[in-house]
């Protein structure tokens, strides 16, 4: 999506591509993202570093924990797990280093010993 179309769809969020002008090296910072659509996937493919939305491990995490009645998708956040989650979305993008940011305190990946943390780490996060 181009900047000219930003805000034309519900769920649009801003991500940044930060470039060192003298070297051309860059990274992406995307703290909120509802879905990794093909145009975004094409931009991220082969990147050396991406900081990405790690708000929730599962879409219904906040509901299951009794914290609120909104899903991650409704709040504009892709889940880490599942067939539409960020682990699956990044699987074939060839990103060298991936770091989750904006991790909600309800997210079990914060627990170093949790199976969710181990799944994220095993997937290169």
Residue ranges and their predicted role:
Residues 1-3:
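Short Pro/Gly-enriched beta-strand edge/turn motifs at strand-loop
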Residues 6, 10-15, 22-26, 34-125:
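Cap/insert and terminal regions of metallo-dependent hydrolase folds
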């Amino acid at each position: 999506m181009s900047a000219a179309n930003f805000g034309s769809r519900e769920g649009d969020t801003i991500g940044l591509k930060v470039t060192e002008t003298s070297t051309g090296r860059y990274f992406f910072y995307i703290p909120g993202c509802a879905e990794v659509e093909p145009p975004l996937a094409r931009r991220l493919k082969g990147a050396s570093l991406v900081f990405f939305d790690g708000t929730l491990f599962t879409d219904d995490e906040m509901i299951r924990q009794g914290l609120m009645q909104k899903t991650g998708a409704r709040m504009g956040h892709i889940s880490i797990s599942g067939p539409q989650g960020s682990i699956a979305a990044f699987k074939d993008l060839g990103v060298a280093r991936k770091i989750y940011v904006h991790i909600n305190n309800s997210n079990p990946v914060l627990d170093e010993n949790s199976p969710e943390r181990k799944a994220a780490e095993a997937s290169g996060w």
